UniProtKB/Swiss-Prot annotation:
GO terms for molecular function: proton-transporting ATP synthase activity, rotational mechanism; proton-transporting ATPase activity, rotational mechanism. The keyword Transmembrane applies. It is a single-pass membrane protein. Belongs to the ATPase B chain family. Its main location: membrane. It comes from Shewanella sp. (strain MR-4). GO terms for cellular component: plasma membrane; proton-transporting ATP synthase complex. This is ATP synthase subunit b. Gene3D superfamilies: F1F0 ATP synthase subunit B, membrane domain. Signal peptide: none annotated. It is found in: Cell inner membrane. F(1)F(0) ATP synthase produces ATP from ADP in the presence of a proton or sodium gradient. F-type ATPases consist of two structural domains, F(1) containing the extramembraneous catalytic core and F(0) containing the membrane proton channel, linked together by a central stalk and a peripheral stalk. During catalysis, ATP synthesis in the catalytic domain of F(1) is coupled via a rotary mechanism of the central stalk subunits to proton translocation. The gene is atpF. The chain crosses the membrane at residues 7-27. InterPro entries: ATP_synth_B-like_membr_sf, ATP_synth_b/b'su_bac/chlpt, ATP_synth_F0_bsu_bac, ATP_synthase_B_chain.
Length: 156
């Protein structure tokens, strides 16, 4: 009988132990396990979100880089066009200035040539008059001298 009482005592003690564990030990363990499961699930969800965010950021960075390259190429193209325009304007301005200087030089040369011709005509007229005076050995009055010079200048 002793065996039966021991078995009943052990059964009662086991039942009390199970009840005590279910009442006081099991709930905190289950709470800890559930909290750990929740943290792990949240961590995995955060990791998935981070991977998606990283992919979006990389795609956005790639798009921005492409856009920046396009913008840079446009700016370079505009700068090259502007450079060509400035060069053409400078060439046109230089050609105009060159033509102006050439025309001015030609005008100065023509004016100097005319002045030299006029001086030469006057000198020739003076020499002709002096030669005529010596030949005629007489002096011509200034009014007659002026008329002769003017006629001689017109003829030359």
């Amino acid at each position: 009988m002793n065996f039966n009482a021991t078995l009943i005592g052990q059964t009662v003690a086991f039942i009390i132990f199970v009840w005590f564990c279910m009442k006081f030990v099991w709930p905190p363990l289950m709470n800890a396990i559930e909290a750990r499961q929740k943290r792990i699930a949240d961590g995995l969800a955060d990791a998935d979100r981070a991977v998606k965010d990283l992919e979006l950021a990389q795609a956005k960075a790639t798009d921005q880089l492409k856009e920046a390259k396009v913008t840079a190429n446009e700016i370079i193209e505009q700068a090259n066009k502007r450079k060509a325009q400035i060069v053409e304007e400078a060439k046109a301005e230089a050609d105009a200035e060159r033509a102006k200087i050439i025309a001015q030089g030609k005008a100065e040369i023509e004016a100097e040539r005319n002045r030299v011709k006029e001086d030469l005509r006057k000198q020739v007229a003076t020499l002709a008059i002096m030669g005529a005076e010596k030949i005629l050995e007489r002096s011509i009055d200034p009014a007659a001298h002026s008329d002769i010079v003017n006629k001689l200048v017109a003829e030359i």
